[in-house]
Amino acid sequence: MMSSPIPHQQTIAAVATAVAPGQGGIAVVRLSGPAAEVVGRSVVSIPGQQLWVSHRVLYGHVMDESGKERIDEVLVLLMKGPRSFTGEDVVEIHCHGGLMAVQRVLERVLAQPHVRRALPGEFSQRAVLNGRLDLTQAEAISELVAARSRRAAQLAMTGVDGGIQRRITSLRERLLDQLSELEARVDFEEDLPPLDAAELLLELQCVRRELEQLVEDAKRGDVLRQGLQVALVGRPNVGKSSLLNRLSRRERAIVTDLPGTTRDVLESEIVLEGVPITLVDTAGIRATKDALEQLGIDRSHQALAAADVAVLVFDLSLGWTADDAALLAQIPDDLPRLLVGNKADLQPASMTASLSNEVDGKTVDVMLSALTGQGEEALIEAVLKTCGASEAQGLVVALNQRQQDLAATAAIALARTQEAAAQKLPWDFWTIDLRQAISSLGEITGEEITEAVLDRIFSRFCIGK
C-alpha cells in the first residue's frame, strides 16, 4: 500500500454528518483534495487576525456569491495532508444542523471550481489508497457507524484499532515464510539442506485451522451486526401483543380481550444482551372470512418465512389445542422455534409443570406471564441460546462477509496444498495454492486488490464517509 498521498485531479465534498429536518445542532461539510484550502478560504469569511494554520479551529461565516449575505455562522478546520483522515488536504466546515443551513453551505462549496460531490465512501477510499487506513479499518469504521448495539460497536472498534489487520497480516506473513522456503527449493534445491516437509505442513495446518476458526467466529459475529428477527406467532388472543409490549417496554400493540385485534404485522426493535433484535408481532393466524384480517395473516406468513426464530405462543389457561398444533405444523422444519406458554399467572404451578407432556410430545421451552413478567428472563435466555447469539458475546474480532469469504478461500487453498503434499507432487505444485491463500489474505487487508474491487466495496458506504 502507498504511504504518500496519491494525487487526485478533483477535490470532493459532502456532508459528513447525518442530516434530517429539524434534527442535530451541528453538521459538518467535509472537503478533501488539492483545492480544499483554496475553496475553504473562498467560501468562509474569517474576521480579525485569525490565520489559516493546519489543525487550528477558526471562526467565521459562509458568505453567498455576492459576499454580502451570511449563509451561516461556522467553525472551520484545515488539516493539511498527510496529517488528515484521507491523507490529503482536508477542510471541515462545522455549521448549524437541520436541513437548510447545511444544504446551502454544501451548495456554496460545490459551486467552486474543481470541486464535485463525493461518491459514497470516497473519503474512506482515498484514506485507504493513501495508506492512512488499511481496508479492514475502513470497513470497520462503516460498521461502527451502522452499529445497532453497544456490543456491535465494541466489536467494530476492534477493527478500527487494527485488530483484524494485525491478525490477518500475521497469518499472511507465516504463509509467506513457508512460500519462501518452497520457492528456494524449487530454484536452488541442490544448494540447500533438505526441507522439513512435516514441519512446513504442520504450520500450514495451524494457519488453516486459525482461518477456519475466524470464519466460524464471524458467523456468530453476524448476529451482533445484523441482529435477529424473532416472530411471535400464535392463535388470536394468546398474548402475543402483550408479550411484545412487555419485552419492548412500551405500548406498541393494542391489547384487548377481543380476538383478532392485531390485524397487521407490528415490529419493535430492542437490544437483548448486546444483540439487536426485531420483534415481529404477527396477526393471529386462523381461518377467517374478514378480508382485512386475512391480509394481516398473509403478512404473518411472510414474516415467519423471514424470521431467525419463531416463538409460538399458546394460552396456558386453555391448554394445547388443535389450532396450536396446526400452527406448529406451519413453521418450517429448518426454522428454530420455541414453544412458549403464556398466562402462567392464571395457572397453579402444578398444572404448568405438567404441561410439558401435553404438547404433542414436545417440551414447552418457557412458561411465562406477559402481564406480570414472570418467566421473561427465561425467554430472553432461550431466544439467544436458540439463535447462537450467546456464543457471540466473547468474540474479540469478527470478519464481515467479504472478509469471511476470502478467509474461507484461503483455507480451501491451504487444504489443496496439503493434498498436493499427500500426493507427493513436486514443490512447485505446492506453491500454486499457497500463493492463492496469500493473495486472498492480502485482499482482506487491501494489500492485493484492484481499484475496481475497491470501488465496489466503498460504493456500499454512506456518502460523507
UniProtKB/Swiss-Prot annotation:
Mg(2+) binds at residues 241, 262. Residues 227-388 form the TrmE-type G domain. It comes from the Bacteria. One of its GO terms (molecular function) is metal ion binding. Its EC number is 3.6.-.-. (6S)-5-formyl-5,6,7,8-tetrahydrofolate binds at residues 30, 92, 132, 465. Signal peptide: none annotated. Its main location: cytoplasm. HAMAP family: GTPase_MnmE. This is tRNA modification GTPase MnmE. It comes from Prochlorococcus marinus (strain MIT 9303). The lineage of its organism: Bacteria, Bacillati, Cyanobacteriota, Cyanophyceae, Synechococcales.
